[in-house]
């Protein structure tokens, strides 16, 4: 009787090894192959503001990350952070018996339906978060380029999930991007509000009772020279300790009528609290970071038109920069 020959052992071993490496989520033992897959590639990352949970939903599946807010995992600061998965830094996958919504994870009291049918808890590995700045398109009129948001690219490395039927390990699992909004910087200055401190060395522009201020310390003496009329006078920002340009956004409003008390003090007062501070990058001759002042007569006095040209601001704490614009009028200063 003719019998079907058995498959050679080397071929069987190669086949088994190939099957064991097909998918990301699988477990393989001596003779059984279990294939399980989860896919959140097309899902958008969202956050629960109450519990600092970042999550993705795909139909009846949910994948969440919970890192204490005190650890500042999604800080608007360019750079890389790594968190070890443990009882504080959690990654959890859940399957439900029906389509899931944010209410199932973000509500103080989750709805009774849908219910959890499967849950995997990560018990080892790390969470890597790489943060970069995302910029707006250049303003058609001014050329200004602002930071619109910060993007946090999240990856799990060597993560182990504990499942009901054993552990599942990923060498690399890309969670995806989670975006946070950048702090809005109004940069809304009335040219007529610019003032010069009595020292003659500090220019500032701020609305009385406003929440922001722009100032230049150690102003070059030639810029306001009233003997040079109709000709643009220029100087470079933040060069040789001159023309130190700074923008401040405050947590609380400036005192009404108190702008000179604040901006002309040395050092500047601690109140109101500074929410964000940005400094002008050092200028490059004929290229960037330029202060330009043109002086003309104004009755018995003078009018100084003050422009900032091709200025980039930087925030060392956040590692970020933004472009203020090609040619911005920051003030028209009147003098006698």
Predicted regions and their residues:
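N-terminal amphipathic/basic-hydrophobic helices that include classical n-h-c signal peptides
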Residues: 1-11, 246, 259-261
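Ser/Thr/Pro-rich, low-complexity mucin-like regions
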Residues: 143-184, 298-323, 334-335
């Amino acid at each position: 009787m003719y019998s079907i020959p058995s498959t050679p052992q080397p071929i069987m071993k190669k086949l088994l090894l190939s099957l064991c490496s097909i998918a990301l989520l699988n477990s393989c033992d001596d003779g059984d192959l279990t294939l399980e897959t989860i896919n959140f590639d097309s899902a958008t990352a969202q956050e629960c503001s109450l519990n600092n949970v970042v999550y993705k939903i795909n139909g009846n599946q949910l994948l969440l990350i919970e890192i204490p807010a005190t650890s500042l995992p999604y800080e608007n600061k360019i750079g890389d952070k790594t968190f070890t998965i443990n009882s504080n830094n959690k990654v959890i996958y859940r399957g439900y018996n029906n389509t899931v919504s944010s209410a199932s994870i973000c509500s103080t009291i989750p709805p009774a339906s849908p219910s959890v049918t499967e849950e995997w808890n990560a018990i080892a590995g790390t969470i890597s978060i790489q943060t970069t700045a995302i910029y707006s398109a250049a303003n058609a009129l001014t050329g200004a380029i602002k930071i619109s948001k910060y993007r946090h690219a999240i990856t799990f490395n060597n993560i182990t999930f504990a499942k009901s039927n054993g552990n599942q390990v990923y060498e690399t699992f890309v969670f995806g991007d989670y975006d946070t909004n950048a702090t809005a910087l109004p940069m809304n200055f009335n040219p007529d509000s610019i003032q010069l401190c009595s020292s003659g060395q500090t220019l500032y522009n701020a609305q009385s009772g406003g929440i922001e201020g722009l100032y230049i310390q150690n102003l070059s003496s030639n810029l306001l020279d009233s003997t040079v009329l109709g000709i643009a006078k220029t100087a470079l920002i933040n060069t040789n300790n001159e023309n130190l340009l700074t923008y401040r956004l405050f947590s609380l409003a400036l005192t009404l009528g108190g702008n000179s008390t604040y901006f002309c003090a040395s050092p500047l007062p601690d109140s109101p609290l500074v929410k964000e501070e940005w400094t002008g990058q050092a200028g490059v001759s004929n290229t960037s970071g330029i202060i330009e002042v043109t002086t003309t007569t104004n009755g018995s006095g003078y009018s100084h038109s003050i422009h900032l040209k091709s200025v980039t601001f930087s925030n060392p704490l956040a590692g970020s920069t933004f472009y203020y614009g090609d040619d911005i009028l920051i003030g028209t200063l009147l003098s006698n």
